């Protein structure tokens, strides 16, 4: 999965953003598990997943701040 773009994240509804965060957290858990057992091939995916979560949370916070 490639890096998520800010425009794509902004186009998501808040529910879709929450679902995306949940899916990325699950993926991150699985990747950490694979790393611990020595099965992880693409180690950069851990970093990408972490940063995608941060991007979504940042956009969600900006959206909430605009509504106030």
Curated annotation (Swiss-Prot):
Which controlled-vocabulary keywords does the entry list?
Ribonucleoprotein, Ribosomal protein
Gene3D superfamilies from the xrefs?
1.10.287.310
Q: Which GO terms describe its cellular component?
A: cytosolic large ribosomal subunit
Instruction: Check the record and name the CDD domains matching this protein.
Output: Ribosomal_L29_HIP
Q: Where are the transmembrane segments?
A: none
Q: Which GO terms describe its molecular function?
A: structural constituent of ribosome
What biological processes does GO assign it? translation
Pfam families in the record, alphabetically? Ribosomal_L29
Q: Which NCBIfam families match?
A: L29
Family, per entry: Belongs to the universal ribosomal protein uL29 family.
Protein name per UniProt = Large ribosomal subunit protein uL29
Query: Organism source for this protein?
Result: Bradyrhizobium diazoefficiens (strain JCM 10833 / BCRC 13528 / IAM 13628 / NBRC 14792 / USDA 110)
Query: Which gene name does the record give?
Result: rpmC
């Amino acid at each position: 999965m490639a890096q998520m773009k800010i425009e794509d994240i902004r186009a998501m509804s808040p529910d879709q953003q929450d679902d995306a965060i949940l899916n990325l957290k699950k993926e991150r858990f699985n990747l950490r598990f694979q790393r611990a057992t020595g099965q992880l091939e693409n180690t950069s995916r851990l970093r990408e997943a972490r940063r995608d979560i941060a991007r979504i949370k940042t956009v969600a916070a900006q959206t909430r701040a605009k509504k106030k």
